[in-house]
Regions:
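ALDH superfamily catalytic-core signature
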Residues: 1-119, 141-143, 147
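Conserved glycine-rich beta-strand-loop-beta hairpin in the small C-terminal domain of fold type I
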Residues: 68-69, 106-110, 126-132, 151-155
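Short, conserved active-site loop motifs that form the nucleotide-linked donor/cofactor pocket
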Residues: 94, 132-133
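Cytochrome P450 core scaffold surrounding the K-helix E-X-X-R motif
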Residues: 120-125
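Short acidic-hydrophobic, aromatic-tinged amphipathic segments that line or gate anion-handling sites
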Residues: 135-139
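Conserved SAM-binding loop
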Residues: 159
């Protein structure tokens, strides 16, 4: 359930260009897939808007179709499981910025971005293993580290900053 820390001194466009394709690679079914995006408050809305715009551009379909950027989920249970996580987050106040629905055939689920996701949402506590990115703001480096480390497990973590001091403190 890899956290991603996005600091306000990062190159935001470059960061978005890197993280969106990585999130939706193999429909988010990668153990080190970036999932929990913690973004510094001063750039939070710009990040969410940019992520949503790029997410709308992720086309789903057959893996051999050159136009497809994302394929299906692994099995029949996954779309229902992802749908339940999205519905739970929305019921707890998250905003659905992109996607949020099952695809129209097979095991597809739309590439999805949820913003303002509270810690109480199930998706903030359990790996979705699917094409859902969740975002929440943070104020300080200490706040970001606490949010990233609040779960007892994780195989990867990512940070985006142009500041050497911030990088060294992490």
């Amino acid at each position: 359930h890899a956290p991603v820390l996005v600091f306000d001194d990062c190159d935001l466009e470059r960061t978005l260009d890197m993280v969106v394709p990585q999130k939706f690679r193999n429909a988010g079914q990668v153990c080190v897939s970036p999932t929990r995006f913690y973004v510094q408050e001063s750039i939070y809305q710009r990040f969410v808007d940019g992520f949503a715009a790029r997410t709308h551009g992720v086309t789903t379909g057959h893996g051999l179709d050159a136009e497809s950027k994302m394929g299906p989920l692994a099995n029949l249970r996954r779309p229902a499981a992802i749908e339940a996580l999205v519905e739970d987050a929305a019921a707890k106040g998250a905003r659905v910025m992109a996607g949020g629905k099952r695809g129209n055939a097979g095991y597809f689920f739309q590439p999805t971005l949820l913003a303002d996701v509270p810690d109480s949402a199930e998706i903030m506590n359990n790996e979705p293993f699917g094409p859902v990115a969740v975002a929440a703001p943070f104020s300080t480096l200490e706040d970001a580290v606490a949010k990233a480390n609040r779960l007892p497990y994780g195989l990867a973590a990512f940070a985006f900053t142009e500041g050497l001091r911030t990088a060294n403190l992490l």
